[in-house]
Amino acid sequence: MHSGTTNPVVRLDLPDDRRAPFAEHCLVRPEHIRRFAQLIGDDHPAHTDPAAAVALGFAGLAAPPTFASMLLLRAERRILPTLLDGAGPVRLLHTDQTLQIGRLLVAGDVIATDVYIESAEQFSDYEKFCVTTVLTDKSGVVVQLGTSTLLSCGHRFRHRIATSPALETARARLHPATHTPHDRQGSLELHRLGPGDELPHSIIRPRHSDVAGFRRLVHDGLPYRISAAGAAPGLLRFGWMARYLGSRFGHPAAVTSYRAEFSHYCVRGPASVADIEFRGRITDIDVSAGMAEVAVNAVSAGRRLFVRASASVPVTAIPSTRPDSPVR
Protein backbone atom coordinates (compact mmCIF):
# COMPACT_ATOMS: atom_id res chain seq x y z
CA MET A 1 0.00 0.00 0.00
CA HIS A 2 1.45 3.36 -1.00
CA SER A 3 0.53 6.80 0.25
CA GLY A 4 0.33 8.18 -3.27
CA THR A 5 -1.37 11.40 -4.29
CA THR A 6 -4.99 11.87 -3.41
CA ASN A 7 -7.38 12.46 -6.29
CA PRO A 8 -10.04 14.67 -4.69
CA VAL A 9 -13.58 13.40 -4.94
CA VAL A 10 -15.78 16.01 -6.56
CA ARG A 11 -18.81 16.80 -4.40
CA LEU A 12 -21.82 17.42 -6.59
CA ASP A 13 -25.02 19.24 -5.65
CA LEU A 14 -27.49 16.41 -6.11
CA PRO A 15 -31.26 16.82 -5.75
CA ASP A 16 -31.48 13.74 -3.52
CA ASP A 17 -29.54 12.76 -0.42
CA ARG A 18 -26.56 10.54 -1.03
CA ARG A 19 -27.95 8.04 1.37
CA ALA A 20 -27.24 4.53 0.17
CA PRO A 21 -30.36 2.92 -1.32
CA PHE A 22 -30.55 0.43 1.49
CA ALA A 23 -32.50 0.15 4.70
CA GLU A 24 -32.84 -2.84 6.95
CA HIS A 25 -34.73 -3.49 10.16
CA CYS A 26 -32.97 -5.67 12.70
CA LEU A 27 -34.56 -7.31 15.73
CA VAL A 28 -32.24 -7.33 18.74
CA ARG A 29 -32.60 -10.79 20.26
CA PRO A 30 -31.57 -11.74 23.80
CA GLU A 31 -29.63 -14.78 22.59
CA HIS A 32 -27.55 -12.55 20.31
CA ILE A 33 -26.84 -10.16 23.19
CA ARG A 34 -25.67 -13.01 25.41
CA ARG A 35 -23.56 -14.54 22.64
CA PHE A 36 -21.89 -11.23 21.82
CA ALA A 37 -21.14 -10.57 25.50
CA GLN A 38 -19.68 -14.07 25.85
CA LEU A 39 -17.39 -13.65 22.84
CA ILE A 40 -15.91 -10.35 24.06
CA GLY A 41 -15.72 -11.68 27.64
CA ASP A 42 -18.06 -9.06 29.14
CA ASP A 43 -19.67 -10.67 32.18
CA HIS A 44 -21.67 -7.67 33.41
CA PRO A 45 -25.02 -9.07 34.64
CA ALA A 46 -26.99 -6.49 32.62
CA HIS A 47 -26.00 -8.46 29.49
CA THR A 48 -27.23 -11.83 30.77
CA ASP A 49 -29.93 -11.15 33.37
CA PRO A 50 -32.98 -9.02 32.44
CA ALA A 51 -33.70 -8.29 36.11
CA ALA A 52 -30.20 -6.90 36.61
CA ALA A 53 -30.59 -4.74 33.51
CA VAL A 54 -33.95 -3.37 34.67
CA ALA A 55 -32.44 -2.59 38.08
CA LEU A 56 -29.94 -0.33 36.28
CA GLY A 57 -32.69 1.53 34.45
CA PHE A 58 -32.77 -0.34 31.14
CA ALA A 59 -36.01 -1.40 29.48
CA GLY A 60 -34.79 -4.97 29.12
CA LEU A 61 -31.68 -7.08 28.68
CA ALA A 62 -28.98 -4.57 27.70
CA ALA A 63 -26.57 -5.20 24.84
CA PRO A 64 -22.87 -4.45 25.38
CA PRO A 65 -22.01 -0.95 24.09
CA THR A 66 -20.31 -2.16 20.90
CA PHE A 67 -23.02 -4.70 20.04
CA ALA A 68 -24.26 -2.04 17.62
CA SER A 69 -21.01 -2.31 15.65
CA MET A 70 -22.21 -5.69 14.41
CA LEU A 71 -25.33 -4.04 12.95
CA LEU A 72 -23.19 -1.30 11.42
CA LEU A 73 -20.87 -3.80 9.77
CA ARG A 74 -23.67 -5.89 8.35
CA ALA A 75 -25.48 -2.85 6.92
CA GLU A 76 -22.28 -1.50 5.37
CA ARG A 77 -21.20 -4.81 3.86
CA ARG A 78 -24.56 -5.47 2.27
CA ILE A 79 -24.73 -2.13 0.47
CA LEU A 80 -21.11 -1.48 -0.53
CA PRO A 81 -20.89 -4.14 -3.30
CA THR A 82 -23.80 -2.39 -5.05
CA LEU A 83 -21.91 0.92 -5.09
CA LEU A 84 -18.43 -0.22 -6.11
CA ASP A 85 -17.04 -0.90 -9.57
CA GLY A 86 -14.28 -3.43 -10.20
CA ALA A 87 -13.63 -7.04 -11.02
CA GLY A 88 -13.40 -9.86 -8.53
CA PRO A 89 -14.61 -10.13 -4.96
CA VAL A 90 -14.74 -7.02 -2.81
CA ARG A 91 -12.10 -7.01 -0.08
CA LEU A 92 -11.97 -4.27 2.50
CA LEU A 93 -9.54 -3.31 5.24
CA HIS A 94 -11.25 -1.86 8.31
CA THR A 95 -8.92 0.81 9.73
CA ASP A 96 -10.98 3.11 11.98
CA GLN A 97 -14.24 2.95 13.92
CA THR A 98 -16.21 5.47 15.94
CA LEU A 99 -19.45 4.90 17.83
CA GLN A 100 -21.67 7.59 19.37
CA ILE A 101 -24.21 6.27 21.84
CA GLY A 102 -27.53 7.85 22.73
CA ARG A 103 -28.62 4.74 24.59
CA LEU A 104 -27.67 1.08 24.64
CA LEU A 105 -29.70 -1.33 22.56
CA VAL A 106 -31.94 -3.69 24.50
CA ALA A 107 -33.61 -7.00 23.71
CA GLY A 108 -36.75 -6.46 21.66
CA ASP A 109 -35.48 -3.33 19.92
CA VAL A 110 -36.34 -3.13 16.23
CA ILE A 111 -33.54 -1.06 14.74
CA ALA A 112 -33.53 0.57 11.30
CA THR A 113 -30.13 1.12 9.68
CA ASP A 114 -29.49 3.93 7.18
CA VAL A 115 -26.11 3.98 5.46
CA TYR A 116 -24.40 7.16 4.22
CA ILE A 117 -21.19 7.37 2.20
CA GLU A 118 -19.57 10.49 3.63
CA SER A 119 -16.32 10.71 1.69
CA ALA A 120 -14.04 8.89 -0.71
CA GLU A 121 -10.39 9.49 -1.58
CA GLN A 122 -8.64 7.79 -4.48
CA PHE A 123 -4.98 6.86 -4.13
CA SER A 124 -2.74 5.15 -6.67
CA ASP A 125 -3.68 1.59 -5.71
CA TYR A 126 -6.59 1.81 -3.30
CA GLU A 127 -9.59 3.88 -2.31
CA LYS A 128 -10.29 5.15 1.19
CA PHE A 129 -13.83 5.96 2.20
CA CYS A 130 -15.86 6.77 5.30
CA VAL A 131 -19.26 5.21 5.88
CA THR A 132 -21.68 6.41 8.56
CA THR A 133 -24.63 4.29 9.63
CA VAL A 134 -27.53 5.72 11.62
CA LEU A 135 -29.43 3.40 13.98
CA THR A 136 -33.02 4.42 14.67
CA ASP A 137 -35.50 2.63 16.92
CA LYS A 138 -39.14 1.87 16.07
CA SER A 139 -40.23 5.18 17.60
CA GLY A 140 -38.03 7.08 15.17
CA VAL A 141 -35.44 8.01 17.79
CA VAL A 142 -31.81 8.06 16.67
CA VAL A 143 -30.12 5.85 19.26
CA GLN A 144 -26.59 5.41 17.89
CA LEU A 145 -24.30 6.55 15.07
CA GLY A 146 -21.26 4.67 13.82
CA THR A 147 -18.59 5.69 11.31
CA SER A 148 -16.19 3.23 9.68
CA THR A 149 -13.09 4.05 7.64
CA LEU A 150 -12.42 1.39 5.02
CA LEU A 151 -9.80 0.77 2.36
CA SER A 152 -10.64 -0.99 -0.91
CA CYS A 153 -8.19 -2.25 -3.54
CA GLY A 154 -9.31 -2.48 -7.15
CA HIS A 155 -12.77 -0.98 -6.65
CA ARG A 156 -14.08 2.56 -7.13
CA PHE A 157 -17.38 4.20 -6.34
CA ARG A 158 -19.75 4.41 -9.29
CA HIS A 159 -21.12 7.75 -8.11
CA ARG A 160 -19.67 10.96 -6.79
CA ILE A 161 -20.32 11.73 -3.15
CA ALA A 162 -22.39 14.64 -1.87
CA THR A 163 -23.02 15.93 1.61
CA SER A 164 -26.32 14.66 2.98
CA PRO A 165 -28.47 17.09 5.00
CA ALA A 166 -30.34 14.08 6.38
CA LEU A 167 -27.17 12.77 8.02
CA GLU A 168 -26.49 16.09 9.73
CA THR A 169 -30.08 16.10 10.95
CA ALA A 170 -29.62 12.60 12.36
CA ARG A 171 -26.48 13.70 14.19
CA ALA A 172 -28.36 16.61 15.73
CA ARG A 173 -31.09 14.23 16.91
CA LEU A 174 -28.69 12.01 18.85
CA HIS A 175 -28.96 12.99 22.50
CA PRO A 176 -27.10 10.72 24.94
CA ALA A 177 -29.33 9.54 27.78
CA THR A 178 -26.46 8.83 30.13
CA HIS A 179 -26.78 6.47 33.07
CA THR A 180 -24.90 7.12 36.28
CA PRO A 181 -23.38 4.13 38.06
CA HIS A 182 -25.84 2.16 40.18
CA ASP A 183 -23.33 2.21 43.04
CA ARG A 184 -22.41 5.85 43.58
CA GLN A 185 -19.92 5.05 46.36
CA GLY A 186 -17.14 4.62 43.81
CA SER A 187 -17.80 7.90 41.97
CA LEU A 188 -15.03 10.46 41.83
CA GLU A 189 -15.86 14.13 42.42
CA LEU A 190 -15.06 16.55 39.59
CA HIS A 191 -12.46 18.44 41.63
CA ARG A 192 -10.52 15.19 42.15
CA LEU A 193 -10.04 14.62 38.43
CA GLY A 194 -7.35 16.04 36.24
CA PRO A 195 -5.55 15.31 32.98
CA GLY A 196 -3.01 12.58 33.57
CA ASP A 197 -5.08 10.62 36.10
CA GLU A 198 -4.85 6.92 35.27
CA LEU A 199 -7.47 4.21 35.49
CA PRO A 200 -6.54 0.83 36.98
CA HIS A 201 -5.21 -1.52 34.34
CA SER A 202 -6.89 -4.75 33.27
CA ILE A 203 -5.56 -7.97 31.79
CA ILE A 204 -7.59 -9.76 29.12
CA ARG A 205 -6.64 -13.22 27.87
CA PRO A 206 -8.36 -13.86 24.52
CA ARG A 207 -9.31 -17.39 23.54
CA HIS A 208 -8.89 -18.47 19.95
CA SER A 209 -12.34 -20.04 20.05
CA ASP A 210 -13.81 -16.62 20.87
CA VAL A 211 -11.87 -14.91 18.07
CA ALA A 212 -13.12 -17.52 15.59
CA GLY A 213 -16.64 -17.36 17.01
CA PHE A 214 -16.68 -13.57 16.72
CA ARG A 215 -15.66 -13.77 13.07
CA ARG A 216 -18.48 -16.21 12.36
CA LEU A 217 -21.00 -14.08 14.24
CA VAL A 218 -20.29 -10.82 12.45
CA HIS A 219 -19.81 -12.33 8.96
CA ASP A 220 -22.72 -14.79 9.01
CA GLY A 221 -24.80 -14.39 5.85
CA LEU A 222 -22.71 -11.57 4.37
CA PRO A 223 -21.96 -11.62 0.63
CA TYR A 224 -18.22 -11.20 1.22
CA ARG A 225 -15.65 -10.95 3.96
CA ILE A 226 -13.47 -8.10 5.12
CA SER A 227 -9.81 -8.22 6.02
CA ALA A 228 -9.34 -7.09 9.60
CA ALA A 229 -6.06 -5.65 10.77
CA GLY A 230 -4.20 -8.32 12.72
CA ALA A 231 -5.40 -11.72 13.87
CA ALA A 232 -8.38 -10.42 15.85
CA PRO A 233 -11.06 -8.44 13.99
CA GLY A 234 -11.05 -4.72 14.66
CA LEU A 235 -14.57 -4.85 16.05
CA LEU A 236 -13.51 -7.53 18.54
CA ARG A 237 -10.80 -5.20 19.82
CA PHE A 238 -13.42 -2.46 19.93
CA GLY A 239 -15.51 -4.75 22.14
CA TRP A 240 -12.56 -5.49 24.41
CA MET A 241 -11.98 -1.76 24.84
CA ALA A 242 -15.61 -1.21 25.84
CA ARG A 243 -15.40 -4.17 28.21
CA TYR A 244 -12.36 -2.63 29.88
CA LEU A 245 -13.92 0.81 30.26
CA GLY A 246 -17.20 -0.63 31.51
CA SER A 247 -15.34 -2.54 34.21
CA ARG A 248 -13.53 0.63 35.27
CA PHE A 249 -16.59 2.88 35.36
CA GLY A 250 -18.98 0.35 36.90
CA HIS A 251 -21.82 0.80 34.41
CA PRO A 252 -22.16 -0.49 30.82
CA ALA A 253 -23.67 2.82 29.64
CA ALA A 254 -21.10 5.12 31.25
CA VAL A 255 -19.28 5.86 27.97
CA THR A 256 -21.06 8.00 25.37
CA SER A 257 -18.59 7.63 22.49
CA TYR A 258 -15.75 5.33 21.44
CA ARG A 259 -13.04 5.97 18.85
CA ALA A 260 -10.32 3.60 17.63
CA GLU A 261 -7.76 3.32 14.87
CA PHE A 262 -6.72 -0.31 14.56
CA SER A 263 -3.13 -1.46 14.28
CA HIS A 264 -2.00 -4.55 12.36
CA TYR A 265 -1.27 -6.83 15.26
CA CYS A 266 -3.16 -8.63 17.98
CA VAL A 267 -2.57 -12.24 18.99
CA ARG A 268 0.03 -14.63 17.64
CA GLY A 269 -0.49 -17.82 15.68
CA PRO A 270 -3.11 -20.47 16.39
CA ALA A 271 -0.98 -22.34 18.93
CA SER A 272 -0.40 -19.43 21.31
CA VAL A 273 -2.42 -17.05 23.45
CA ALA A 274 -1.02 -13.69 24.52
CA ASP A 275 -2.42 -11.60 27.36
CA ILE A 276 -3.61 -8.10 26.50
CA GLU A 277 -3.02 -5.32 28.99
CA PHE A 278 -5.45 -2.39 28.85
CA ARG A 279 -4.72 0.97 30.43
CA GLY A 280 -6.65 4.23 30.47
CA ARG A 281 -5.68 7.81 31.19
CA ILE A 282 -7.73 11.00 31.56
CA THR A 283 -6.47 13.40 28.88
CA ASP A 284 -8.94 16.27 29.14
CA ILE A 285 -11.94 17.47 31.15
CA ASP A 286 -14.57 19.87 29.81
CA VAL A 287 -16.04 21.31 32.99
CA SER A 288 -18.88 23.13 31.23
CA ALA A 289 -19.97 19.98 29.41
CA GLY A 290 -19.24 17.69 32.35
CA MET A 291 -17.31 15.32 30.10
CA ALA A 292 -13.89 13.70 30.35
CA GLU A 293 -11.77 12.31 27.52
CA VAL A 294 -10.00 9.02 28.17
CA ALA A 295 -7.11 7.65 26.10
CA VAL A 296 -6.91 3.87 25.98
CA ASN A 297 -3.82 1.79 25.27
CA ALA A 298 -3.80 -1.98 24.78
CA VAL A 299 -0.59 -3.99 24.45
CA SER A 300 -0.17 -7.67 23.60
CA ALA A 301 3.30 -9.27 23.60
CA GLY A 302 4.86 -5.82 23.46
CA ARG A 303 2.78 -4.59 20.52
CA ARG A 304 -0.14 -2.20 20.46
CA LEU A 305 -3.62 -3.24 19.36
CA PHE A 306 -4.58 0.34 18.49
CA VAL A 307 -2.72 3.14 16.79
CA ARG A 308 -4.89 5.31 19.01
CA ALA A 309 -8.10 4.82 20.95
CA SER A 310 -10.20 7.06 23.15
CA ALA A 311 -13.61 7.52 24.73
CA SER A 312 -15.85 10.27 26.11
CA VAL A 313 -17.25 9.78 29.61
CA PRO A 314 -19.51 11.95 31.80
CA VAL A 315 -17.47 12.91 34.86
CA THR A 316 -20.19 11.60 37.20
CA ALA A 317 -19.51 8.13 35.79
CA ILE A 318 -15.82 8.05 36.63
CA PRO A 319 -14.90 6.06 39.75
CA SER A 320 -12.12 6.72 42.20
CA THR A 321 -8.94 5.27 40.73
CA ARG A 322 -6.56 3.14 42.75
CA PRO A 323 -3.38 2.11 40.90
CA ASP A 324 -3.14 -1.02 43.03
CA SER A 325 -6.49 -2.49 41.96
CA PRO A 326 -6.14 -4.19 38.55
CA VAL A 327 -9.08 -6.20 37.26
CA ARG A 328 -8.95 -9.51 35.47
Model-derived features: positions:
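A conserved acidic, glycine/proline-rich C-terminal tail/linker
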Residues: S257-F262
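Hot-dog-fold acyl-thioester-processing enzymes
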Residues: H2-H94, F157-T256, S320-R328
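Residues that form or immediately flank small-molecule/cofactor binding pockets and catalytic motifs
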Residues: C153, I204-P206, Y265, V287
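Beta-strand-rich interaction surfaces with strong enrichment in secreted/lumenal proteins
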Residues: I101-R103, A228, S263-H264, R268
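HotDog/MaoC-like acyl-thioester-processing domains
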Residues: H2-P21, H94-P195, P270-R328
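Short, proline-centered helix/strand-breaking motifs
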Residues: L104, G250-A254, Y265
